[in-house]
Amino acid sequence: MHLLIPAAGRGSRMGADGNKLLLPLSGRPLLAWTLAAAAQAPSTRWIGIIGQPMDEEAIRLLAQKLGLRVPVHWIEGGETRQQSVYRGLLALPVEAQQVLIHDGARCLASPALFERCAAALAEFSAIVAAVPVKDTIKQVYPQSRQVEKTIPREQLWAAQTPQGGNVGRLKAAHAWAAAQAVAVTDDAALCELRGEPVQVVPGEETNLKITTPADLLVAEAILKTQLRQDPSP
């Protein structure tokens, strides 16, 4: 499986000056946990990290120190995540048929989750890891913040990554979005807008996206528990 990891990760909400993916988490940079888990998935055979030029040296060194069993390639990203993913798709080897896309900030995804998503692509043309919503969701008027209605949660799932699909179709979807100035927050949404079915793959409750300092504390606690159970990360 070919894997793209968007890793721009500006740390404004973390209170960090640089890339939040280079912040320490349980003794190693946050991105190192993401890479290690991805490389441990048996089907992973190629990883492309998409980032900004100012982070290239640090990320290259990080990947080198990990000594991963799969090749890791650097891809210069664009101004937005969507542009960066498109650049990543264009940089894939010509033999790539399916691709997974995983946010670098989701550093707790397990190798098993990568494998489930890769296996699903043998059957479905587009997939997204997701978990059922547990909270009650309120739709709110934006100006007054008054509740408009409560949305039944039985059919609601919280999207995660990995997401992925057929390389040709994803390239076409991103090219279409660029031409039409369509902006989305994840790759599955592009497939949806193009009328393509997207299959949900059961995600993981621990697969949180590190966005705030509180997320970092939660991730630290989860990792400590996991490392006690299995000391080899």
Curated annotation (Swiss-Prot):
CDD domains assigned to the protein according to its UniProt record, in alphabetical order: CDP-ME_synthetase (cd02516)
Matches recorded under InterPro entries: IspD, IspD/TarI, IspD/TarI_cytidylyltransf_bact, ISPD_synthase_CS, Nucleotide-diphossugar_trans
GO BP, sorted A to Z: isopentenyl diphosphate biosynthetic process, methylerythritol 4-phosphate pathway
EC number, as in UniProt: 2.7.7.60
Catalytic activity of the protein: 2-C-methyl-D-erythritol 4-phosphate + CTP + H(+) = 4-CDP-2-C-methyl-D-erythritol + diphosphate
Pfam families: IspD
UniProt keyword NAD present: no
Swiss-Prot/TrEMBL site (Positions MEP for the nucleophilic attack) positions: R153, K209
Alphabetical keyword list: Isoprene biosynthesis, Nucleotidyltransferase, Transferase
Broad enzyme group: transferase
Marked site (Transition state stabilizer) residue numbers: R13, K20
NCBIfam families: ispD
Function text: Catalyzes the formation of 4-diphosphocytidyl-2-C-methyl-D-erythritol from CTP and 2-C-methyl-D-erythritol 4-phosphate (MEP).
Family statement: Belongs to the IspD/TarI cytidylyltransferase family. IspD subfamily.
UniProt name for this protein: 2-C-methyl-D-erythritol 4-phosphate cytidylyltransferase
Species: Gloeobacter violaceus (strain ATCC 29082 / PCC 7421)
Gene: ispD
